[in-house]
Amino acid sequence: MKKIVFTGGGSAGHVTPNLAIIPYLQEDNWDISYIGSHQGIEKTIIEKEGIPYYSISSGKLRRYFDLKNIKDPFLVMKGVMDAYVRIRKLKPDVIFSKGGFVSVPVVIGGWLNRVPVLLHESDMTPGLANKIALRFASKIFVTFEEAAKHLPKEKVIYTGSPVREEVLKGNREKGLAFLGFSRKKPVITIMGGSLGAKKINETVRSALPELLKKYQIVHLCGKGNLDESLQNKEGYRQFEYVHGELPDILAVTDFVISRAGSNAIFEFLTLQKPMVLIPLSKFASRGDQILNAESFERQGYASVLYEEDVNVKSLIKYVEELSQNNEKYKTALKKYNGKEAIKTIIQNISEA
């Protein structure tokens, strides 16, 4: 039986692509383990899936000054030792890393054990963890073709982003019933990220009188951001977040307004949903969402509404443009084959 160790954590975005790949390896009877941090989100997600989980010490990698920067390099070194010992016991044939600060000790520990390491980079430019890890990797899978210019060419394989199978299996009728929506008006799903986005939430709610004339709205507004005064508004459903219902909601969705995190937008792309993308500004991030969104716009999958330009008038304008040019967007979206991503990654894992 072949063995694989997965790693990646710190945010859900460093875990969900692993969850897209794991079921296919389980079908092929791989022995699967996961190495992550002691208290990261990856621990909760992976243990819920029933996959053996091993925790190690890890320090956060920061690009800015923080007193914790003095302590954290020692935690990383301890994490390398923890990972080295654990990998030596597990004896995997291959390690697959999705990035995040916890992945660095695992990648180095794998390399020290002479285990082939495969990385996946979701964004246009590598994050700090993958920048460190890539020198220890034998192959690097990239979500965006443009990412290749930032990485060692001899290691790069373009795959796109692996998408969870359950996301593709939504039921439109169940979605309509869950939302209480009719079939008469198109549905817009609006997502501001797991924590929500104050400016997006406020603008959407201010634009409701105009938007609800032509559309039905699903608003995933983030934890603590519900507006009780709108709970019974016809044609408008708001949720802090959804779990099992998301595939059915996406099956109902005609258009998406969203942040531009790589995993989410590739799910919309695979489902062929035209998008208005509102990337996090450079003030709130390293600018990766802006690059992601602009790439999608160049390929005809989406239009980009920059954070600083978000207001009621611009939001309505972008929604109308999306609606009027729906067929143009759909034609572009059909060119992408999302199923190839998992197929290519599985093939390379098997050959490692």
Curated annotation (Swiss-Prot):
EC number(s) reported in the record: 2.4.1.227
Binding site for UDP-N-acetyl-alpha-D-glucosamine: 11-13, 164, 194, 289
GO terms for biological process, alphabetical: carbohydrate metabolic process; cell division; cell wall organization; lipid glycosylation; peptidoglycan biosynthetic process; regulation of cell shape
Keywords: Cell cycle, Cell division, Cell membrane, Cell shape, Cell wall biogenesis/degradation, Glycosyltransferase, Membrane, Peptidoglycan synthesis, Transferase
Function: Cell wall formation. Catalyzes the transfer of a GlcNAc subunit on undecaprenyl-pyrophosphoryl-MurNAc-pentapeptide (lipid intermediate I) to form undecaprenyl-pyrophosphoryl-MurNAc-(pentapeptide)GlcNAc (lipid intermediate II).
Membrane topology classification: Peripheral membrane protein
Superkingdom in the source lineage: Bacteria
Family the UniProt entry places it in: Belongs to the glycosyltransferase 28 family. MurG subfamily.
Transmembrane segments: none
GO molecular function: glycosyltransferase activity; UDP-N-acetyl-D-glucosamine:N-acetylmuramoyl-L-alanyl-D-glutamyl-meso-2,6-diaminopimelyl-D-alanyl-D-alanine-diphosphoundecaprenol 4-beta-N-acetylglucosaminlytransferase activity; undecaprenyldiphospho-muramoylpentapeptide beta-N-acetylglucosaminyltransferase activity
Catalytic activity reported: di-trans,octa-cis-undecaprenyl diphospho-N-acetyl-alpha-D-muramoyl-L-alanyl-D-glutamyl-meso-2,6-diaminopimeloyl-D-alanyl-D-alanine + UDP-N-acetyl-alpha-D-glucosamine = di-trans,octa-cis-undecaprenyl diphospho-[N-acetyl-alpha-D-glucosaminyl-(1->4)]-N-acetyl-alpha-D-muramoyl-L-alanyl-D-glutamyl-meso-2,6-diaminopimeloyl-D-alanyl-D-alanine + UDP + H(+)
InterPro entries in UniProt: GlcNAc_MurG, Glyco_trans_28_C, GlycoTrans_28_N
Name of this chain's protein: UDP-N-acetylglucosamine--N-acetylmuramyl-(pentapeptide) pyrophosphoryl-undecaprenol N-acetylglucosamine transferase 2
NCBIfam families: murG, PRK12446.1
Keyword Glycoprotein annotated: no
Subcellular location(s) of the protein: Cell membrane
Pathway as given in its UniProt record: Cell wall biogenesis; peptidoglycan biosynthesis
